Amino acid sequence: MTDKLIIFDTTLRDGEQSPGASMTKEEKIRIAKHLERMKVDVIEAGFAASSNGDFDAIHTIAGLVKDSTICSLARANDKDIQRAADALKPANSARIHTFIATSPLHMEKKLRMTPDQVFEQARLAVRFARKFTDNVEFSPEDGSRSDLDFLCRVLEAVIAEGATTINIADTVGYGVPELYGNLVKTLRERIPNSDKAIFSVHCHNDLGMAVANSLAGVKIGGARQVECTINGLGERAGNTSLEEIVMAVKTRKDYFGLDVGLDTTQIVPTSKLVSQITGFVVQPNKAVVGANAFAHASGIHQDGVLKARDTYEIMRAEDVGWTANKIVLGKLSGRNAFKQRLQELGVSLDSETELNAAFMRFKDLADRKSDIFDEDIIAIVSEESAFAQEQEHYKFVSLSQRSETGEQPQAKVVLALDGKEVTGEARGNGPVDATFNAIEGEVGSGSELLLYSVNAITTGTQAQGEVTVRLSKSGRIVNGVGTDPDIVAASAKAYIAALNKLHSKDDKLNPQRS
């Protein structure tokens, strides 16, 4: 049995299924590049059959990412598998991940298939996938609620057909650690050809036990792959958190006895990128990547850490990518210094045009804000990269406001609609409401505001505000993110970013889930 734990990241597929976390192709590419830099073993880049947009994203990522295996999800049918294979053609290393539900509830109520029909479809799906690659993963959806004898029968058959990874899906987060770990162990013991495949765990966090269940699957069950997402992103209560799995196994190597090949210094930068793109703010007390993960407020704890860090710290903050909040650049800094700092942060822009545009935004910010931090630079580049790579139907031009005591604030917003400037004016219950009303008066999107949140990128009164806006229309939910030292301007940018995503025609199907 290998002593390495394979990390399978599904942020771009299962993570994206979280309401409001839908990503553009360009955003997926940026995250995929960060995952490759982190040395993630397998990147599930999407579900090729779900939409042309997802197919295109997988195909592009497969051509750009060379050091990680690129995977596409596919239902257990020839059409889905063919689509996945086509999307993965440019990949140096490709994997097809096919699945079908095996629990009595899912077979009867959702699939309306008999166990024998499911058995045959699973077997034939793996056989067909093997025509395109020798790296095939099979997942029994809702595996943790499946009949054990039937599950053994299905898994033995798909391994015989050539499945090289068997992924035990706790699709609804029903498992508890001891039972789930023993399920994986029992499957490996009872299936005669289990030694021909690597067993994997895929857990959801509905009862708050996704990480615990995954670790039990590894320690008790002998699984050697964990499927997880950055920040635990995922539908409902989320998925197994990559950062927690990786650091648990590394920190407690004495217990797990496994190696993880990731560059853990990339964890926090990647966490921040995913949070910025999706608009899902990381809770301050989140393990490993939360702002308070390495903070000590108790006087006793502070005294201990000052004397010896290991009194209260079991990990080093710098080992997961936390850096001191240092002032790095100012208004006198030149283009070369800006470019060098981007390289030090591991940030790349695709063209000189993007670099020049980002530098101009940096100079504009430096004129308004005396101290520029790494977080400011990352926010600038993230927003500029999104502007450069996405087609903007709506573009923010300018904003002015007027507010007098006892009267509703008034906002005047200038927008460019496909290059033509229009001006909207409106009042509202506060400056942000007035601004949104002014935008809607010109755009008329008919969308519903589901979420409005503000986060300070750095500390101090000069800090940039990062605003997340979540809009819903006709069943589609999108996030928009905007940054600016002026919170109302940041709000306008975020609202417009969300409108641009709504305007996109790349609607997705609602796939079966594992």
UniProtKB/Swiss-Prot annotation:
Mn(2+) binds at residues 14, 202, 204, 239. InterPro entries: 2-IPM_HCS-like (IPR050073), 2-isopropylmalate_synth_dimer (IPR013709), AIPM/Hcit_synth_CS (IPR002034), Aldolase_TIM (IPR013785), LeuA/HCS_post-cat (IPR054691), LeuA_allosteric_dom_sf (IPR036230), LeuA_bact_synth (IPR005671), PYR_CT (IPR000891). Its EC number is 2.3.3.13. Its cofactor is Mn(2+). It catalyses: 3-methyl-2-oxobutanoate + acetyl-CoA + H2O = (2S)-2-isopropylmalate + CoA + H(+). Keywords: Amino-acid biosynthesis, Branched-chain amino acid biosynthesis, Cytoplasm, Leucine biosynthesis, Manganese, Metal-binding, Transferase. Residues 5-268 form the Pyruvate carboxyltransferase domain. HAMAP family: LeuA_type1 (MF_01025). Catalyzes the condensation of the acetyl group of acetyl-CoA with 3-methyl-2-oxobutanoate (2-ketoisovalerate) to form 3-carboxy-3-hydroxy-4-methylpentanoate (2-isopropylmalate). This is 2-isopropylmalate synthase.
